[in-house]
């Protein structure tokens, strides 16, 4: 499957990215190469291979939750351009 400029524009729109024409060309080639590697993996014969979810045989490496000193709200918000009621105000990203 060949990645087109339209495919790159679609992905960029989903990611809310603005790309130049040069970047679109570059990313189309890079995405095409990456998907080519995925197609190679599809050719592998995996009959008789046990499915795995982890590369290392390790399960649930838990640690104790411990509180540690932090910077505090006032210091965290010190450089915030528009804090509101002790929180960061950020631009709306979902329409």
Curated annotation (Swiss-Prot):
<dbReference type="GO" id="GO:0050566">
    <property type="term" value="F:asparaginyl-tRNA synthase (glutamine-hydrolyzing) activity"/>
</dbReference>
<dbReference type="GO" id="GO:0006412">
    <property type="term" value="P:translation"/>
</dbReference>
<keyword id="KW-0436">Ligase</keyword>
<dbReference type="GO" id="GO:0050567">
    <property type="term" value="F:glutaminyl-tRNA synthase (glutamine-hydrolyzing) activity"/>
</dbReference>
<dbReference type="Pfam" id="PF02686">
    <property type="entry name" value="GatC"/>
</dbReference>
<dbReference type="InterPro" id="IPR036113">
    <property type="entry name" value="Asp/Glu-ADT_sf_sub_c"/>
</dbReference>
<dbReference type="GO" id="GO:0070681">
    <property type="term" value="P:glutaminyl-tRNAGln biosynthesis via transamidation"/>
</dbReference>
<comment type="function">
    <text>Allows the formation of correctly charged Asn-tRNA(Asn) or Gln-tRNA(Gln) through the transamidation of misacylated Asp-tRNA(Asn) or Glu-tRNA(Gln) in organisms which lack either or both of asparaginyl-tRNA or glutaminyl-tRNA synthetases. The reaction takes place in the presence of glutamine and ATP through an activated phospho-Asp-tRNA(Asn) or phospho-Glu-tRNA(Gln).</text>
</comment>
<comment type="subunit">
    <text>Heterotrimer of A, B and C subunits.</text>
</comment>
<keyword id="KW-0067">ATP-binding</keyword>
<protein>
    <recommendedName>
        <fullName>Aspartyl/glutamyl-tRNA(Asn/Gln) amidotransferase subunit C</fullName>
        <ecNumber>6.3.5.-</ecNumber>
    </recommendedName>
</protein>
<dbReference type="GO" id="GO:0006450">
    <property type="term" value="P:regulation of translational fidelity"/>
</dbReference>
<dbReference type="GO" id="GO:0005524">
    <property type="term" value="F:ATP binding"/>
</dbReference>
<comment type="similarity">
    <text>Belongs to the GatC family.</text>
</comment>
<keyword id="KW-0547">Nucleotide-binding</keyword>
<keyword id="KW-0648">Protein biosynthesis</keyword>
<dbReference type="InterPro" id="IPR003837">
    <property type="entry name" value="GatC"/>
</dbReference>
């Amino acid at each position: 499957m060949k990645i087109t400029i339209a495919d790159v524009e679609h992905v960029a729109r989903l990611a809310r990215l603005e790309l130049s024409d040069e970047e679109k060309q570059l990313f189309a080639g890079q995405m095409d190469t990456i998907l080519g590697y995925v197609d190679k993996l599809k050719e592998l014969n995996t009959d008789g291979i046990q499915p795995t979810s982890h590369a290392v045989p390790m399960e649930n490496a838990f640690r104790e939750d411990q509180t540690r000193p932090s910077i505090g709200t006032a210091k965290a918000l010190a450089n915030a351009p528009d804090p509101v009621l002790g929180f960061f105000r950020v631009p709306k990203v979902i329409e």
